[in-house]
């Protein structure tokens, strides 16, 4: 398996282009199932997860192509398989997002229960509850979510918790349902707004996206569209945490600062100089950062997907930070690896107390999930000596050529390639 070898101590300087948002691209690719016409999508990141999604759609009969210019075209005019099998779904939780489009357009779906990062239980029960409210006959059978409906009927649905993928799935199901659907307690993430904007281009009638109450008036059919995926706010935040920990002065191009309010506030509190424009962010850091605590919340709160990266910055900060993880259980698996590098961190339930040390020391560490792997890279950049990060297939799920971008900023980082174990 591939590894990253990082020699710490180099400051980061220069410019880097932020890729399209993984968490926007995945549901947008699934939206291609809602029409027989082509979707032409720009700024789709080249990631393991997007490649897996394209393979899954291809398995269903969708024509899915990535051009040399980075444009992805999907056309679901010859769908002949309404099953999402375990061998593809097991590596990516977002594959549950084919459920809503398949059910809405074809009246049936058989989707294996998903995998992805091992962060808590992340149940799909809210998806099932919502589809049932829309009139689907839906059940779990032999590890699959099995659903069918002649035509979905609009309904008022309040999820028991705020769920991003649940909101996306129900949104895609409702656009072709008969009548009006109201999603209460809906997630408000920018990626949901991006999906809704695409669906509107396709002919959907949606209001309230970006709020906790989304109203969808179903239509008989959708048509093709062109769309550009929004920039990845988590990738942008990750690079800003990296310069905060390692020091330096970087500019992020193709960034969306208006989606990063909570993250930028924390980084300013940590001592970074932050400047923004319509599509760029500059982050600069001299000396050690100040310790800054955070409580993760649904958008527009501080993102759970930024918790591990902020913790990596706090490990080398002046002072003590308290971080509380409110979204997922079992999301501190990076802590034991950071401790191997000399980090001083105590965990009590959902709370982490991070006491900054002057310098981490390089060590061999192992990535356990997507954002944890990013935190270990940040720690390696700030550490003395050499760090080797194993299991970086987690990193490749959500970051487009991270080591290449960091190297362009002056980091001493190399990918060591190796064969997968038998």
Curated annotation (Swiss-Prot):
It is found in: Cytoplasm. The keyword ATP-binding does not apply. The keyword Cell division applies. Keywords: Cell cycle, Cell division, Cell shape, Cell wall biogenesis/degradation, Cytoplasm, Peptidoglycan synthesis, Pyruvate, Transferase. It catalyses: phosphoenolpyruvate + UDP-N-acetyl-alpha-D-glucosamine = UDP-N-acetyl-3-O-(1-carboxyvinyl)-alpha-D-glucosamine + phosphate. Its main location: cytoplasm. Signal peptide: none annotated. GO terms for biological process: cell division; cell wall organization; peptidoglycan biosynthetic process; regulation of cell shape; UDP-N-acetylgalactosamine biosynthetic process. The active site is at 117 (proton donor). The modification 2-(S-cysteinyl)pyruvic acid O-phosphothioketal is found at residue 117. Its EC number is 2.5.1.7. Pathway: Cell wall biogenesis; peptidoglycan biosynthesis. GO terms for molecular function: UDP-N-acetylglucosamine 1-carboxyvinyltransferase activity. Pfam families: EPSP_synthase. UDP-N-acetyl-alpha-D-glucosamine binds at residues 93, 122-126, 305, 327. Cell wall formation. Adds enolpyruvyl to UDP-N-acetylglucosamine. Belongs to the EPSP synthase family. MurA subfamily. This is UDP-N-acetylglucosamine 1-carboxyvinyltransferase.
